[in-house]
Amino acid sequence: MNAISGGLNKVSFTNRKRIRKSFGRIPETTPMPNLIDVQRASYDAFLQMHVSPDSRTNSGLQEVFKSVFPIDDFAGRGRLEFVYYELEEPKYDVEECIQRGMTYAAPLKVVLRLIVWDVDEDTGARSIRDIKEQPVYMGDMPLMTDNGTFVVNGTERVIVSQMHRSPGVFFDHDKGKTHSSGKYLFAARVIPYRGSWLDFEFDAKDLIYVRIDRKRKLPVTTLLYALEGRATEALRAAREAKGESLEIGEIRGMDAEEILTYFYGKVPFTRTRTRDGETAWARPFEPETFRGAKLVEDLVDAETGEVVAKADDKLTARVARQIAVKTRTVLVSRADLIGRYVAEDLFDPNTGEIFADAGEEISEAKLKTFEDAGLDEIPTLAIDQAKGPWIRNTLAADKNASREDALIDIYRVIRPGEPPTSETAEALFRGLFFDAERYDLSAVGRVKMNMRLGLECEDTVRVLRKEDILRTIQIMCELKDGRGQVDDIDNLGNRRVRSVGELMENQYRIGLLRMERAIRERMGSVDIDGVMPHDLINAKPAAAAVREFFGSSQLSQFMDQTNPLSEVTHKRRLSALGPGGLTRERAGFEVRDVHPTHYGRICPIETPEGPNIGLINSLATFAKVNKYGFIETPYRLVKDGKVLDEYKYLSAMEEERLTVAQADAPKLADGTLTEDLVSVRRNGDFRLVKPDEVTAIDVSPRQLVSVAAALIPFLENDDANRALMGSNMQRQAVPLIKSDAPLVGTGMEAPVARDSGATIVARRAGVIDQIDGARIVVRATGEDGTTQGVDIYRLRKFMRSNQSTCINQRPLVRVGDRVGAGDIIADGPSTELGELALGRNVLCAFMPWNGYNFEDSILISERVAREDMFTSIHIEEFEVMARDTKLGQEEITRDIPNVGEEALRNLDEAGIVYIGAEVNPGDILVGKVTPKGESPMTPEEKLLRAIFGEKASDVRDTSLKLPPGVNGTVVDVRVFNRRGVDKDERALAIERAEIERLAKDRDDERAIQERAFLNRLREKLLGQVAGSGYKGVRSGTEITTELLAEIPRGAWRNLTVQDDRVMAEIETLKREFDASVHKLQQRFESKVEKLQRGDEMPPGVMKMVKVFIAVKRKLQPGDKMAGRHGNKGVVSKVVPIEDMPFLEDGTPVDVVLNPLGVPSRMNVGQILETHLGWACANLGRQIGEAVEAYQRDVAERERLHAMLKSVYGEEIYNEQIASMSDAELRELCGNIRKGVPIATPVFDGARITDIEDMLAKAGLDVSGQMTVCDGRTGEQFERKVTVGYMYMLKLGHMVDDKIHARSIGPYSLVTQQPLGGKAQFGGQRFGEMEVWALEAYGAAYTLQEMLTVKSDDVSGRTKVYEAIVREQDNFEAGVPESFNVLTKELKSLGLNVDLNLSVD
């Protein structure tokens, strides 16, 4: 239970610079959880890195070690125990790992204890001989970065959480599909977390069978016979109390009587005498049995002989209860006994002979035998129309009759072909479900089982119990009898999330189990007295399991780093695919569909289009994953029709008991629900109830959708399919050089920017001390304003993301600014003033324009391209390696054979391109030469070689050249050298620059610390009496400001004072300062040492150079653009500004969109956004004019304030704006003069009336339409046009990446046809259908060219080239190489094919 905090609306440093007006009516009272906590919390719980070893919980890595250790050797002489583990400091930090292509990981040291026993050969008693304890290195454990990612081999990866079916017991039926009669065949399945599956099922004859691990089925009673009987359980308990154990021979299974007693009650039939003196049979009267039955004959009270109900009467429940008050037993005819089943073995009281076994049917003959033997009571099974004979019939059909038979039968099914013995059968059966090492239900499975079966059992009991199996079969029989409900496997109560920590735990367990076998074998093969723990351990299997998981698991994915939203969404993704999950092909509609329990947990909108639809989902905004892996969503509690000030996170199972109202249910200020009937959700249905029946209410309207869907304004006005496209396309928006935050937002922009890690967030409150383009230095201050330390934030400048977009951070603060903890101090890619900014606000008109916006094409103004509104920077990385080859070392050099000076103009003396050089396709980036093979030399060459020495002819040019289609500016070069290899001048220059940067950081931090230390020292010294010890200050002198001013600041620390307490405080201060300076120096030296040490390289590589090139991409025809409502299109034409349609005041529009794209797509949200954006922009312009007037004339201040009050409303104005200083007000107005930013939260946004009010305030037509003139003629269009500001994005599908043309290029080796694809610089495929087209036109020569000289006629290609060189135009086509391939293949089949080209 959580109380609602009042601090949700704290105004941050950036919020004051640009205030976003919200149209939301429902106050946000519940804090939204951090968006990437799913990842971080899971991995922290797995590693427990910052928890001391003795207080770690038994989960995650700790549990893996505890479950595998201790390991005993086969002889019982040695045991290896796990004591604790610790993670040391990682060798490189995150940035270094990305640069060097390393994995960000920490060495894992495990302390193991080896115990050696002395074993007495006669008695077998053991005594400890030796105990050895030692830390053992167990490989590196990858660490998670602060942003929830892993750096593996230099690239950032994300482990996607997996949805899978929860362990536990599930009941289902075949929906009548199996049997021709259409009757339901019920089944139950016990799914463990680890171990054998257990399936129970009815067959068409209504017998119950069991399958173990989907093997051949057995009658369920075979399994029941194999379970221990009551007598054995009692015996086991008695033995365990004495500390003894049971022998295998003493174990007895359940017998038929015990099985039947568990599943059926007993109905005793007794012999009685009637009033007439005749003998008859009577049975107890139970209202439940007779309820709803139609009587065949009169119902007679056995004691009084009175008729209590007439024949042909139908007994209602009420009548049956009334009869039961007076009547205990009723008479029955002999015919009622015939066909019933005996409940227990019946003996002849005289001879002891068995008349009937338990479960046997009573026939006429049997009944006569019972009567003749004088049996006065026959116990029968309580089988009637309400309870079917399913177990009894199965028992009758089962050929086994004892535990031994049953165990052997089970053994034969599990291990067919192996000869069973009673010992192996017993061991196998025990290992299947009752051995904690092989079977694990997990805590979740046990909790789910308890809930479904109505049992109470600790969640530490992870194996199956006899009670679980019996209760499962009992519930299945009840389902068959028509009582209870089957389970819905798509309910989120039955599906759970496996996050990073759990996936990693399973993987590490696999690695440790591989190790365990090796350790056991090694313990047996060495002299155990003389070894230490590390001699027994080979950590490679564990390290390999981890490496394999991060490198190649389906759930370890290359992070989508296009923009901050795509990062956040990727980390919040839930996949039903992956190991142990579903496959695309097998997943049906039900599992992909939206389920009522998804509400507030999984987004119903955001999922991929295509084969993965519904299998990959996104967490909803407020959702969390609980300790059992179930997704929870928060609800505010409601009591007696009043909303309380507390909220609670609930899973789908817990929500079943609640009646939940919508967040927008009308209520008073104190939370009282006002409507007579409230619309609520209960058990997945919608209904209307009275307010006092409501038990909970949604915390926010946006808790239903994911982060990406919550960023779409007017989502409620868009069709779901288009909203899905809108959510997915926002993730593809490339960061622009200058992004705008949307004028029409939803209020989610700031949380996404903050939690994504794209921006820099202040860790502690403080004052900005220094700032430049690459770093921010904050002098941290405590709560009381005293200096606490220094925080240096390094900005990421022009770094390449996984998708080659540009990561660049810009400071938002100035020197002297005060910032609080959690404030955003630097913007990153696609953020502006701490808010997500994926695109630009552009002036759009919905109208046709000469057919250029046919089929969703987009027409843009030249101004958009010229002012770089949609220009993005992409950073391409190129690398070259100098290897040690058999012929000698490759060399990176400027001295390249047969290359002119012009081609080397961008290279320095080391042969590496300069930073800042403008490069074009074909330019050399890094010069490299490779030794050539020794070819036989002529005598002349030998002579020349002897005279002139080694020549350049020994090497060939293998330089790194810029590939076609790329041109840009070199922004960074990194040189890596193998350890022990001499560094070239360029590598040394880069190293020097890096050391200077580190030294500057160290010096600045030291200076701030020293300043703080001296200030605190000064406070301590002032007013004190000086002691002896400092030359120039007499003992007994009072220390004043003037005295301190005369002494150099550095010498203050040498002063002493007579007050011992103060002197002790000064000594402590000095010690703390010296320690922090020492730590600083150590950190600096370790970083420098790493820089100078040289790099770890792949085998055979001596040197590696990486060149990063920034490519500037302007918006051009062929680029894909989109809005946030699924309205996507391709730029068709860039029109000169003067030709664009313009408004009455002469403003040309930026973008023209097709109005036909709206009605059929049903995404009307884009129109509402356009109207509201138009109002925002015009209000901003008015505020801008008012600010200019105020700057000219101070008297205009009141008008400006009145305008701001009118726009933002009284509450925000009084809270935030009224108290602003002049400079703050000017900054605010400067930031909103392009448009007043507004938030229209999803499902709680601006109404039509709000939009009309805004348009009216801005002095615009409330229709939102304007008169527009044609830019070419200047004439007005005949009707008004919808014009306004829409937020447009440029998507990652750019024409530059796709367009491609080939002149000459590589050919396939066998077919000699050109390769395909842009990456191979391939040709265009001229396929079968294209051939048909040329055939249809009769273009014979063109067709011949296409199939021969332009494709795979090798000699013909050469002749064409020669003809072109000679400036001739005659050539002849030969035989295509593919024809030769065909003849060769026919020959390989033994068919000799000869091509006879002679002309008769």
Swiss-Prot record:
Its EC number is 2.7.7.6. The RNAP catalytic core consists of 2 alpha, 1 beta, 1 beta' and 1 omega subunit. When a sigma factor is associated with the core the holoenzyme is formed, which can initiate transcription. NCBIfam families: PRK00405.1, rpoB. The keyword Nucleotidyltransferase applies. It catalyses: RNA(n) + a ribonucleoside 5'-triphosphate = RNA(n+1) + diphosphate. InterPro entries: DNA-dir_RNA_pol_bsu_ext_1_sf, DNA-dir_RNA_pol_bsu_external_1, DNA-dir_RNA_pol_su2, DNA-dir_RNAP_su2_dom, DNA-dir_RNAP_su2_hyb_sf, RNA_pol_bsu_bac, RNA_pol_bsu_CS, RNA_pol_bsu_protrusion. One of its GO terms (biological process) is DNA-templated transcription. It is an enzyme of class 2 (transferase). One of its GO terms (molecular function) is DNA binding. Keywords: DNA-directed RNA polymerase, Nucleotidyltransferase, Transcription, Transferase. It comes from Acidiphilium cryptum (strain JF-5). It holds the Pfam family RNA_pol_Rpb2_45. This is DNA-directed RNA polymerase subunit beta. One of its GO terms (cellular component) is DNA-directed RNA polymerase complex. DNA-dependent RNA polymerase catalyzes the transcription of DNA into RNA using the four ribonucleoside triphosphates as substrates. CDD domains: RNA_pol_B_RPB2. Belongs to the RNA polymerase beta chain family. It comes from the Bacteria.
